[in-house]
Amino acid sequence: MKISDIPFVTTDWSTVPPERHAGDSGEAIWRVQYFGPEENRIRVRMVEYSPGYSADHWCSKGHIILCLEGEMETTLADGRVMPLRAGMSYQVADGAEAHRSATKAGAKLFIVD
């Protein structure tokens, strides 16, 4: 990720329209903003997983994820399970370990990719 051509800007996440994304179970509500030029666009999201959410796909995209509330587990393709609780983050590169997330009680995340 190269951060360039982004002027100083603030985001009031409560004004960003929600997008609903169904999981294998539960849903994820995304509030999304894009920054920077098209060829190097950075996606910034506030994401809320409902209780019982389980992702419907394996992801190979790189992310920086900060858990703001709740907790979730991310399962890696090799079988490892990584817990993420409020105040914790994880970082993974594009094309690195495929991962898939789930939560029992729900979680609120701040994600940059």
How should each PLM-predicted stretch be described?
Residues 56-57, 74-75, 92, 97-104:
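Short beta-strand His + acidic residue motifs that chelate non-heme Fe in jelly-roll/DSBH
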Residues 1-43:
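A short, N-terminal "cap"/entry segment at the start of jelly-roll beta-barrel domains
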Residues 89-92, 104-113:
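A short hydrophobic beta-strand segment most commonly corresponding to one strand
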Residues 78-95:
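Short acidic-glycine-tyrosine-enriched beta hairpin
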Residues 49, 58-74:
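Short, conserved beta-strand element in jelly-roll/cupin
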Residues 40-59, 93-96:
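Conserved short histidine dyad/triad with adjacent acidic residue
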